[in-house]
Amino acid sequence: MNVKIEESWRKRLQEEFDKPYFEKLVAFVKSEYGHANVLPPGHQIFHVFNSCPFEKVKVVILGQAPYPNPGQYYGVCFSVPEGVAIPGSLANIFKEIHQDLGKPIPTSGNLDRWVAQGVFPMNSVLTVRAHETGSHRNMGWEIFTDAVIKKLSEERENLVFMLWGAYAKEKAALINSSRHLILTTVHPSPRSAEYGFFGCRHFSKANDFLRSRGIQEIDW
């Protein structure tokens, strides 16, 4: 199957695109876009892939499902477009960065600046019906994004994987911990951040690891 995605990713994921589950997933997603309000706009489904080539990835942040409110999600996990109110989880991420590294808290929730440096924030599920949280779960996206994680683990070295919350922590089984740094804690959601996300210092730990491997750190 021919999927419009950045070339370095296409070469590594073509095997997935040709599998029966992905063909079924594409048929489902096309049907959904045809009769429902689905997020993000179709051309933005692979935005984070198109913005961060495979060989440029340094830090992987795993999320679960897209924001379900129109105007929020554009293909980058936790991020929102310029001018959109910063969601609670992202506000807590910024708060932890401020406490960890002393960085000022941004007024914009757009994380494209991170992506340009090699941060790869990816949801496990890449589409959602508007106002219906998790409505596209168990349709095949999880199989695909698990394959992405495995590819990164197998073909790259010295990556940082940030796994926040019980769901993301399960993905540690897909990652070779002898080749990469795996950082886990609770989700930054306002419901859970105070139980371990605040004070986790994942952002300084990531930079310390990258520096120790001779890799340019992230300007969070």
Where do the PLM segments sit?
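Short, conserved glycine- and acidic-residue-centered signature motifs
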Residues: 199
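Generic N-terminal amphipathic, Lys/Arg-enriched alpha-helix
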Residues: 1-13
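A polyanion-binding, active-site-adjacent surface
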Residues: 3, 15-163, 167-170, 175-176, ...
